[in-house]
Every structure is written in C-alpha cells, then in structure tokens.
Amino acid sequence: MTLAQFAMIFWHDLAAPILAGIITAAIVSWWRNRK
C-alpha cells in the first residue's frame, strides 16, 4: 500500500461521517425552519 492509497482511505474514513453529519444537520435545520 502506498502513502497515497493510505491517505485516500484515511480521508474517506474521516470525510464520509463528517459529510453525512453536515448533510443531516442541514436537512434537520431546513425541516425545522419549514414548519
């Protein structure tokens, strides 16, 4: 495994949950503002 491959796996493991959390928070806040 090269350093680039390790960095990509590490980035995806960190970025995926963070992005999911941001998207979820955005949808929840939009849903609350809509009501």
Swiss-Prot record:
TM region positions: 8-28
Among InterPro entries, the record links this protein to: Toxin_Ldr
Keyword annotations from UniProtKB, A to Z: Cell inner membrane, Cell membrane, Membrane, Toxin-antitoxin system, Transmembrane, Transmembrane helix
Which cellular component appears as one GO term in the record? plasma membrane
Pfam families annotated for this entry? Ldr_toxin
- Give the UniProt subcellular location, in the record's own words: Cell inner membrane
Q: How does it sit in the membrane?
A: Single-pass membrane protein
Q: What induces it?
A: Expression of the proteinaceous toxin is probably controlled by an antisense sRNA, in this case RdlA. Only a few of these TA systems have been mechanistically characterized; the mechanisms used to control expression of the toxin gene are not necessarily the same.
The highest taxon in the source lineage is Bacteria
What does the protein in this record do? Toxic component of a type I toxin-antitoxin (TA) system. Inhibits ATP synthesis possibly due to its insertion in the cell inner membrane, ATP levels drop over 50% 2 minutes after induction. Overexpression is toxic leading to cell death, it inhibits cell growth within 30 minutes; C-terminally tagged versions of the protein are toxic while N-terminally tagged versions are not.
The record's family statement is: Belongs to the Ldr toxic peptide family.
Protein name (Swiss-Prot/TrEMBL): Small toxic polypeptide LdrA
Organism encoding this protein: Escherichia coli (strain K12)
Q: Which gene encodes it?
A: ldrA
